[in-house]
Amino acid sequence: VIMTSATLATGTVGGFDHASRRMGCPDAETIQLGSPFHFSDQMKVFVDSTMPEPSEASYLTRLSDRVLELVRMTGGGAFVLCTSFKIIEQLMDRIGEQLAGVGGPVLVQGRDGPPSKLLEEFRAAGDGVLVGTASFWHGVDVRGYALRNVIITRLPFDVPDRPLVEARSERVKAGGGHPFMDDALPRSLIRFRQGVGRLIRSSHDEGIVAILDSRVLRKPYGRQFLAALPEGVPISDLASGEASDVSGLA
Protein backbone atom coordinates (compact mmCIF):
# COMPACT_ATOMS: atom_id res chain seq x y z
CA VAL A 1 0.00 0.00 0.00
CA ILE A 2 1.40 3.40 -1.00
CA MET A 3 -0.08 6.54 0.58
CA THR A 4 0.85 9.96 -0.79
CA SER A 5 -0.16 13.50 0.10
CA ALA A 6 1.40 16.94 0.15
CA THR A 7 0.49 17.23 3.83
CA LEU A 8 0.89 13.80 5.42
CA ALA A 9 3.74 15.26 7.47
CA THR A 10 3.58 18.13 9.94
CA GLY A 11 6.64 19.77 8.40
CA THR A 12 8.67 19.43 11.60
CA VAL A 13 11.11 16.84 12.97
CA GLY A 14 9.37 13.46 13.11
CA GLY A 15 6.71 14.88 10.85
CA PHE A 16 5.26 11.52 9.78
CA ASP A 17 4.84 10.19 13.34
CA HIS A 18 1.33 11.55 13.83
CA ALA A 19 -0.04 10.25 10.52
CA SER A 20 1.63 6.86 11.01
CA ARG A 21 0.07 6.43 14.46
CA ARG A 22 -3.37 7.53 13.28
CA MET A 23 -3.33 5.00 10.44
CA GLY A 24 -2.12 2.20 12.67
CA CYS A 25 1.22 1.72 10.91
CA PRO A 26 3.86 3.29 13.18
CA ASP A 27 6.65 1.31 11.51
CA ALA A 28 5.78 2.34 7.95
CA GLU A 29 8.61 3.44 5.67
CA THR A 30 8.40 7.15 4.90
CA ILE A 31 10.01 9.54 2.47
CA GLN A 32 9.55 13.29 2.04
CA LEU A 33 10.32 14.67 -1.41
CA GLY A 34 11.07 18.27 -2.30
CA SER A 35 8.64 20.58 -4.04
CA PRO A 36 9.03 21.61 -7.69
CA PHE A 37 8.08 25.16 -6.71
CA HIS A 38 10.53 27.94 -5.78
CA PHE A 39 8.69 29.15 -2.71
CA SER A 40 11.36 31.63 -1.65
CA ASP A 41 10.84 33.51 -4.92
CA GLN A 42 7.11 32.99 -5.29
CA MET A 43 5.76 33.98 -1.89
CA LYS A 44 6.28 36.11 1.18
CA VAL A 45 4.96 35.40 4.66
CA PHE A 46 3.88 38.09 7.10
CA VAL A 47 3.21 37.70 10.81
CA ASP A 48 1.95 40.29 13.28
CA SER A 49 3.87 40.48 16.55
CA THR A 50 1.44 43.07 17.94
CA MET A 51 -1.77 41.10 17.36
CA PRO A 52 -3.62 40.38 20.63
CA GLU A 53 -4.15 36.72 21.41
CA PRO A 54 -7.58 35.32 20.44
CA SER A 55 -8.67 35.28 24.09
CA GLU A 56 -8.14 39.05 24.48
CA ALA A 57 -11.03 41.51 24.17
CA SER A 58 -9.31 43.63 21.52
CA TYR A 59 -8.55 40.68 19.22
CA LEU A 60 -11.56 40.91 16.89
CA THR A 61 -11.19 44.64 16.35
CA ARG A 62 -7.50 44.32 15.52
CA LEU A 63 -8.12 41.24 13.39
CA SER A 64 -10.79 43.04 11.38
CA ASP A 65 -8.54 46.04 10.79
CA ARG A 66 -5.66 43.84 9.62
CA VAL A 67 -7.83 41.76 7.29
CA LEU A 68 -9.20 44.90 5.65
CA GLU A 69 -5.72 46.39 5.33
CA LEU A 70 -4.32 43.25 3.71
CA VAL A 71 -7.21 42.83 1.27
CA ARG A 72 -6.84 46.45 0.18
CA MET A 73 -3.10 45.99 -0.20
CA THR A 74 -3.54 43.34 -2.91
CA GLY A 75 -6.75 44.72 -4.38
CA GLY A 76 -8.66 41.57 -3.49
CA GLY A 77 -7.66 38.17 -4.80
CA ALA A 78 -7.80 36.96 -1.21
CA PHE A 79 -8.80 33.92 0.79
CA VAL A 80 -9.67 34.86 4.38
CA LEU A 81 -9.38 31.54 6.21
CA CYS A 82 -11.29 31.37 9.49
CA THR A 83 -11.66 28.60 12.05
CA SER A 84 -15.41 28.93 12.70
CA PHE A 85 -18.58 30.39 11.25
CA LYS A 86 -18.82 32.58 14.35
CA ILE A 87 -15.59 34.35 13.43
CA ILE A 88 -16.83 34.78 9.85
CA GLU A 89 -20.00 36.45 11.14
CA GLN A 90 -18.06 38.70 13.50
CA LEU A 91 -15.68 39.79 10.73
CA MET A 92 -18.48 40.51 8.29
CA ASP A 93 -20.39 42.53 10.91
CA ARG A 94 -17.33 44.72 11.36
CA ILE A 95 -15.86 45.08 7.87
CA GLY A 96 -18.31 43.53 5.41
CA GLU A 97 -19.24 46.86 3.81
CA GLN A 98 -15.62 48.01 3.57
CA LEU A 99 -14.56 44.74 1.93
CA ALA A 100 -17.30 45.19 -0.65
CA GLY A 101 -15.78 48.55 -1.52
CA VAL A 102 -12.40 47.06 -2.45
CA GLY A 103 -13.67 46.21 -5.91
CA GLY A 104 -14.46 42.54 -6.44
CA PRO A 105 -17.24 40.36 -5.04
CA VAL A 106 -17.16 39.35 -1.38
CA LEU A 107 -18.10 35.68 -1.14
CA VAL A 108 -18.98 34.37 2.30
CA GLN A 109 -19.29 30.70 3.17
CA GLY A 110 -22.63 29.94 4.79
CA ARG A 111 -24.24 33.02 3.24
CA ASP A 112 -23.65 33.09 -0.51
CA GLY A 113 -24.09 29.47 -1.55
CA PRO A 114 -22.27 26.14 -1.40
CA PRO A 115 -18.45 26.05 -1.47
CA SER A 116 -18.35 24.88 -5.10
CA LYS A 117 -20.36 27.93 -6.22
CA LEU A 118 -18.22 30.33 -4.20
CA LEU A 119 -15.05 28.85 -5.65
CA GLU A 120 -16.33 29.14 -9.22
CA GLU A 121 -17.30 32.79 -8.73
CA PHE A 122 -14.00 33.58 -7.03
CA ARG A 123 -11.98 32.11 -9.90
CA ALA A 124 -14.00 34.04 -12.46
CA ALA A 125 -13.78 37.39 -10.64
CA GLY A 126 -10.01 37.80 -10.46
CA ASP A 127 -10.27 40.34 -7.63
CA GLY A 128 -12.71 38.67 -5.26
CA VAL A 129 -12.54 38.08 -1.52
CA LEU A 130 -13.60 34.67 -0.24
CA VAL A 131 -14.23 34.37 3.49
CA GLY A 132 -14.45 30.73 4.49
CA THR A 133 -13.78 28.08 7.05
CA ALA A 134 -12.82 24.38 6.95
CA SER A 135 -13.89 23.72 3.33
CA PHE A 136 -11.34 26.21 2.00
CA TRP A 137 -8.32 25.27 4.11
CA HIS A 138 -7.69 22.21 1.93
CA GLY A 139 -8.72 20.51 -1.28
CA VAL A 140 -9.32 23.65 -3.36
CA ASP A 141 -7.16 24.80 -6.25
CA VAL A 142 -7.11 28.38 -7.58
CA ARG A 143 -4.23 28.98 -9.95
CA GLY A 144 -2.99 32.29 -11.26
CA TYR A 145 -3.62 35.88 -10.31
CA ALA A 146 -7.14 35.27 -8.95
CA LEU A 147 -5.60 34.11 -5.65
CA ARG A 148 -2.61 36.14 -4.53
CA ASN A 149 -3.31 36.66 -0.83
CA VAL A 150 -4.04 34.01 1.82
CA ILE A 151 -4.96 35.39 5.24
CA ILE A 152 -4.88 32.95 8.16
CA THR A 153 -6.94 34.58 10.87
CA ARG A 154 -6.13 32.10 13.61
CA LEU A 155 -4.12 28.92 14.13
CA PRO A 156 -6.47 26.07 13.21
CA PHE A 157 -6.76 24.18 16.48
CA ASP A 158 -9.81 22.01 17.08
CA VAL A 159 -12.35 23.24 19.63
CA PRO A 160 -11.26 21.26 22.74
CA ASP A 161 -14.74 20.63 24.17
CA ARG A 162 -16.18 18.99 21.05
CA PRO A 163 -17.15 15.38 21.87
CA LEU A 164 -14.90 13.86 19.20
CA VAL A 165 -11.92 15.98 20.30
CA GLU A 166 -12.52 15.07 23.94
CA ALA A 167 -12.68 11.38 23.00
CA ARG A 168 -9.38 11.61 21.12
CA SER A 169 -7.79 13.36 24.09
CA GLU A 170 -8.95 10.65 26.47
CA ARG A 171 -7.58 7.97 24.17
CA VAL A 172 -4.18 9.69 23.97
CA LYS A 173 -4.04 10.06 27.76
CA ALA A 174 -5.03 6.42 28.23
CA GLY A 175 -2.05 5.46 26.08
CA GLY A 176 0.32 7.55 28.18
CA GLY A 177 0.52 10.44 25.72
CA HIS A 178 -0.01 14.19 25.93
CA PRO A 179 -3.27 15.28 24.23
CA PHE A 180 -1.95 18.64 23.09
CA MET A 181 1.53 17.68 21.92
CA ASP A 182 0.59 14.27 20.51
CA ASP A 183 -2.77 15.07 18.92
CA ALA A 184 -4.02 18.68 18.93
CA LEU A 185 -0.75 20.28 17.82
CA PRO A 186 0.09 17.84 14.98
CA ARG A 187 -3.46 18.10 13.62
CA SER A 188 -3.27 21.89 13.69
CA LEU A 189 0.15 21.89 12.00
CA ILE A 190 -1.13 19.76 9.13
CA ARG A 191 -4.22 21.95 8.70
CA PHE A 192 -2.01 25.04 8.85
CA ARG A 193 0.24 23.67 6.10
CA GLN A 194 -2.84 22.92 4.04
CA GLY A 195 -4.07 26.49 4.44
CA VAL A 196 -0.71 27.99 3.48
CA GLY A 197 -0.64 25.60 0.54
CA ARG A 198 -3.68 27.23 -1.07
CA LEU A 199 -1.46 30.02 -2.40
CA ILE A 200 1.13 28.38 -4.63
CA ARG A 201 -0.51 25.85 -6.94
CA SER A 202 1.81 26.15 -9.94
CA SER A 203 5.25 27.45 -10.87
CA HIS A 204 3.65 30.67 -12.12
CA ASP A 205 1.76 31.60 -8.94
CA GLU A 206 2.91 34.42 -6.67
CA GLY A 207 1.54 36.10 -3.58
CA ILE A 208 1.56 36.57 0.16
CA VAL A 209 0.45 34.65 3.23
CA ALA A 210 -0.45 36.62 6.35
CA ILE A 211 -0.62 34.85 9.72
CA LEU A 212 -2.70 36.98 12.08
CA ASP A 213 -2.07 34.96 15.22
CA SER A 214 0.81 36.17 17.37
CA ARG A 215 1.04 32.81 19.13
CA VAL A 216 3.41 31.73 16.35
CA LEU A 217 5.88 34.18 17.91
CA ARG A 218 4.88 34.18 21.57
CA LYS A 219 4.21 30.55 22.44
CA PRO A 220 6.88 27.82 22.64
CA TYR A 221 4.92 25.69 20.17
CA GLY A 222 4.69 28.63 17.75
CA ARG A 223 8.13 27.85 16.36
CA GLN A 224 6.74 24.60 15.00
CA PHE A 225 4.26 26.50 12.83
CA LEU A 226 7.01 28.69 11.43
CA ALA A 227 9.15 25.59 10.84
CA ALA A 228 6.23 24.05 8.92
CA LEU A 229 6.36 26.84 6.32
CA PRO A 230 8.12 26.11 3.01
CA GLU A 231 11.88 26.24 3.44
CA GLY A 232 13.54 29.54 2.62
CA VAL A 233 10.38 31.63 2.49
CA PRO A 234 11.02 35.19 3.75
CA ILE A 235 9.08 36.04 6.92
CA SER A 236 8.42 39.67 7.88
CA ASP A 237 6.55 41.39 10.69
CA LEU A 238 3.50 43.41 9.69
CA ALA A 239 4.22 45.68 12.65
CA SER A 240 7.44 46.80 10.95
CA GLY A 241 5.58 48.19 7.95
CA GLU A 242 7.35 45.86 5.50
CA ALA A 243 4.02 44.60 4.16
CA SER A 244 3.66 47.82 2.19
CA ASP A 245 6.17 46.39 -0.29
CA VAL A 246 4.65 43.40 -2.05
CA SER A 247 5.78 44.41 -5.51
CA GLY A 248 6.11 41.49 -7.87
CA LEU A 249 4.23 39.20 -5.52
CA ALA A 250 0.68 40.49 -5.40
Walk through the language-model features, giving the residues of each:
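ASCE RecA-like P-loop NTPase motor cores
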Residues: 1-250
